[in-house]
Amino acid sequence: MSLRLVNLGLPKSGTTTLGHALKLAGLRVADYRIRPHQTGGRDAREGAFVADLLYRGLYGSGDPLAHLDGFDALSETSRLRGRSVWPQTDFALIEALRARHPGLRFVATRRDAFAMAQSMLRWSDMVARLTRMPVPGLPAGYGETAAQRMRWIEGHYAFLAAVFGDDPRYLELDVAATDAPLRLGAHLGIDLPWWGTANANPEST
């Protein structure tokens, strides 16, 4: 099965919930990086970051998905460990995906901007990395306050809305909405047997 869905949402937007729901629906999901159990130890991609594979394809053959065969969905694409790589913010990469794969569906998971900003604060050293590394729309030195992170978050989803317009292949999905699983299932043409909260912050209420 060729890849069917790419999530363009930011970290802490519900990417793990999305990935878990898709896995339980029978899809093979790459979330952030390629895990050993997904390759059987016989694949050079083992341990590779999804972000790096997307750019390897884009700047190799022109197809961002060239090195992601065998997967049905990408639930988180950015990288902020060691390097700062953000495919979901890259117009050229998104346009290459749309042109090369006309049947590909896109989703942008999101939550309330303040909730996302606070979740980033509580998750490991994410805010320290955000402020230290250059991130598209959030230069190094910014992102320490919730207000700055919220401005960046809102700007990202406004960017995606401007890029896709009324393209039916794109769905902005509030993962906390009661109809989220129904909307996502309809978008993909599948039934989702589970929807909930995965990878929750231990401090969250």
Give a label for each model feature.
Residues 1-71, 77, 195-196, 205:
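PAPS-dependent sulfotransferase catalytic core
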Residues 17, 21, 96, 152-163, ...:
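Amphipathic alpha-helical segments that form well-ordered structural scaffolds
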Residues 23, 58-65, 84-181, 186, 190:
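PAPS-dependent sulfotransferase catalytic domain
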Residues 33-43, 107-121, 158-205:
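The conserved 3'-phosphoadenosine-5'-phosphosulfate
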Residues 49-57, 82-86, 149:
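Short, flexible loop segments at the rims of nucleotide/cofactor-binding pockets, characterized by
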Residues 70-71, 101, 167:
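Short, well-ordered alpha-helix to beta-strand connector turns
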Residues 75-83:
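N-terminal substrate-binding region of glycoside hydrolase catalytic domains
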